[in-house]
Amino acid sequence: MKKITISDLNNWKEVGEKFASITAYDASFAKIFEEQSMPVIIVGDSLGSVIQGKPTTLDVSIEELVYHTKCVRAGSPNAFIISDLPFMSYHTPEAACGSAAKLMKAGANMVKIEGGSWLINTVKMLTERAVPVCAHLGLMPQAVNIYGGYKLQGKTEEQATKMLENAKELQRAGAQALILECIPAKLARQITLELHIPVIGIGAGNDTDGQVLVMHDILGISANYIPRFSRNFLAETGSIEAAVKKYIDEVKQQTFPGEKHCF
């Protein structure tokens, strides 16, 4: 696999070529994903749940994200790596810059932050300092205590309008990609069409530019349960390599996610 850059993601959006992405946390799995030509890997604070066994992502530290980013980069030298900024590591623009610098030095190509218009100045500052930003809207796991659980977002017209406005504001501020999580497929389609940056969905329908799933979910090894929007590809194929390839192929062909995986 050739080295993937933000230019590739932009080109895929322009020509309408769908792409898959997946979470990873260690070199061994990252190597398998690279061998199957997985173009984008997300080193997520979801490691708090699937690696550390905690009920939320809130306790994950920047040092842990740095460690896992280094591990993933060692296993996948060519994938485009997006690393999460964990809870309260970007509460001010200055704090975000310090945290992001650590992830970029560890091998990330882009950092991801959860939040809407309050992050405008942070996105501007990071972008001006050569740190590419992936915004994250919809269900934001770091805000679980605000929601009272992991719930579908953007259900009302007011919520949908605000989310679209936030997406456009973050794009204007310099965000170069966007993740939409657990929102109605119709809203995700509208946001994807109205933005010029790549939009990656998880539980956001079939019309986003890319898809992402947690690796533990597609391999059927999640500690708790597999979300409605995911699928156990390993059970269908019998090997990790075949499961990953099937996931990549079905995203490209737009056969996954199917209607039953959407809201």
Swiss-Prot record:
Cofactor, free-text remark: Binds 1 Mg(2+) ion per subunit.
**What are this entry's molecular-function GO terms?**
3-methyl-2-oxobutanoate hydroxymethyltransferase activity; magnesium ion binding
Q: Name one GO cellular component term.
A: cytoplasm
Binding positions (Mg(2+)): 45, 84, 114
**Record-listed E.C. numbers:** 2.1.2.11
| Any one of the GO BP annotations | pantothenate biosynthetic process
Q: What is its main location?
A: cytoplasm
- What does the UniProt entry say about where the protein is found? Cytoplasm
InterPro entries the UniProt entry points to: Pantoate_hydroxy_MeTrfase, Pyrv/PenolPyrv_kinase-like_dom, Pyrv_kinase-like_dom_sf
**Has keyword DNA-binding?**
no
Cofactor(s) annotated in UniProt? Mg(2+)
Record's keyword terms, sorted: Cytoplasm, Magnesium, Metal-binding, Pantothenate biosynthesis, Transferase
The function of this protein is: Catalyzes the reversible reaction in which hydroxymethyl group from 5,10-methylenetetrahydrofolate is transferred onto alpha-ketoisovalerate to form ketopantoate.
What is said about its interaction partners and assembly? Homodecamer; pentamer of dimers.
Q: Which HAMAP family does the entry link to? A: PanB
The entry sums up its family as follows:
Belongs to the PanB family.
Query: What is the name attached to this protein's record?
Result: 3-methyl-2-oxobutanoate hydroxymethyltransferase 2
Query: What organism does the UniProt record list as the source?
Result: Aliivibrio fischeri (strain ATCC 700601 / ES114)
